[in-house]
From Swiss-Prot:
Name of the top EC class for this enzyme: lyase
Gene3D superfamilies: Transcriptional regulatory protein pf0864 domain like
Family label: Belongs to the LarC family.
Statement: the UniProt record of this protein carries the keyword Lyase: yes
Stated name of the protein: Pyridinium-3,5-bisthiocarboxylic acid mononucleotide nickel insertion protein
EC number of the protein: 4.99.1.12
Catalytic activity: Ni(II)-pyridinium-3,5-bisthiocarboxylate mononucleotide = pyridinium-3,5-bisthiocarboxylate mononucleotide + Ni(2+)
Length: 406
């Protein structure tokens, strides 16, 4: 399993996180190519350069925009709503995985800002998430996670800082109000620095994606990235360290999860499909529907969602908000997962990623990535099944049935 391990002892911000992921090995040219799919209004440029603090070499980034002429402030004053951000991401040509990751971060940030300002998450006008540089920071991080083939994200305690910070609403205490709300999702420390160590964007990223580092975490550190911040002359280095760890796994990896479910007989299929989307955006790992017959003989659906324990509150709230059910059943369960790897396979018509699961240290089951095969089929006009076979057997004639899964 490929895990990112965050050392946030000096805090985390959106620009430091993206810089650390680039320093870790995410391809910058490919990142900019993917980011261009967002069609953000106005010109922007990702400036990436080597930097040092306290003798440690790393990467520093700036997002140069047409509107601002520079970046570096995490409290930019460009107004957008969550509805604008959602439309920007959902209508882009980014992969579904990247869209889900980015939206999960933005959604958490929007919920925190909405609570601070006393409005709804879709209607809130908030400045940090609306700035072009923050859109690039969050969407860029989601793209980098996919490029680096990250399976899971871990973090140690996150330093929030102390003092005050100046934004459009005036001088605010550190942590900023939204950061303080987001900090309920992870273990935090205070007063380790005399500045704003963690921004709302950085807090939302950790809250949406990271789990506490297990003890012990066995594996090989295959790469380390350092994101260098813009603050100078601090007693504590303004640096974010991220390590890529190839973990040593058991044959199956047990994982404690929460299942939430409800029987619903008064929602349309369109409404339950929309509910499933909202559950995934709220942090569910999976959601599904089962046909059931209720006590008065009425046909209904049992809507279920599976999530990490720390995401339970958010998923349960989305369940109530977007469904007609007055009650939700909840219980814990263990999920056992075989070790899995994903690798690109080059075919005569393009690249297809193939997932392989392992038992007893040997390949057990292979499956061609559907989205890659779908894109290949649309580009070439070949049948989808043939494109799936090309991913599994790139040098075969693809005329015969295969034993691997397509």
């Amino acid at each position: 399993m490929r895990a990112l391990v965050y050392d946030c002892s000096a805090g985390i911000s959106g620009d430091m996180n993206l810089a650390a992921l680039i320093d870790l090995g995410a391809d910058r040219e490919n990142l900019e190519r993917e980011l261009s799919k967002l069609h953000v209004h106005g010109e922007w440029k990702l400036e990436c350069r080597p930097a040092q603090q306290h003798g440690i070499r790393g990467t520093r980034i700036d997002v140069l925009t047409e509107e601002e002429g520079h970046s570096g402030s995490s409290h930019a004053h460009h107004h957008r709503t969550m509805a604008d951000i959602r439309k920007l991401i959902e209508t882009s040509a980014l992969s579904n995985t990247v869209k889900r990751t980015a939206l999960s971060i933005f959604t958490l940030l929007a919920e925190a800002e909405a609570r601070v300002h006393g409005t709804t998450s879709e209607e809130v006008h908030f400045h940090e998430v609306g700035a072009v540089d923050s859109i690039i920071d969050i969407a860029g991080a989601a793209i980098c996670l996919e490029m680096l083939r990250v399976d899971t994200v871990f973090t140690g305690p996150v330093e929030l800082g102390s003092g005050t910070v100046t934004c459009q609403h005036g001088t605010m205490p550190v942590p900023a109000p939204a950061t303080a709300l987001l900090a309920k999702h992870f273990r935090a420390t205070l007063n380790g620095t005399t500045h704003e160590a963690t921004t709302p964007t950085g807090a939302a990223y950790i809250a949406a994606l990271a789990q506490p580092v297990p003890s012990p975490l066995a594996g090989r550190i295959t790469a380390t990235g350092y994101g260098i911040g813009h603050r100078q002359g601090l007693p504590v280095p303004n640096i974010l360290r991220v390590m890529l760890v190839e973990t040593e796994e058991e044959e199956t990896s047990p994982e404690l999860l929460t299942e939430l479910c409800a029987n619903i007989d008064d929602m349309t299929p369109e409404q339950t499909a929309y509910l499933a989307e909202k559950l995934m955006e709220a942090g569910a790992l999976d959601t599904w529907q089962e046909s059931v017959c209720m006590k008065k003989g009425r046909l209904a659906v049992k809507v279920c969602a599976l999530c990490q324990p720390e995401q339970t509150d958010r998923v349960r709230e989305a369940f109530f908000r977007h469904s007609s059910t007055p009650g939700i059943r909840q219980h814990g369960m263990l999920r056992h997962i075989l070790r899995r790897e994903s690798a690109p396979v080059h075919t005569p018509h393009g690249t297809v990623h193939v997932k392989t699961s392992f038992m007893h240290g040997r390949p057990h089951y292979r499956k061609a990535e559907f989205e890659d095969c779908r894109i290949l089929a649309e580009k070439t006009g070949l049948p989808l099944g043939q494109c799936q076979l090309m991913g599994l057997f790139p040098t075969s004639s693809h005329d015969n049935d295969a034993t691997d899964s397509v």
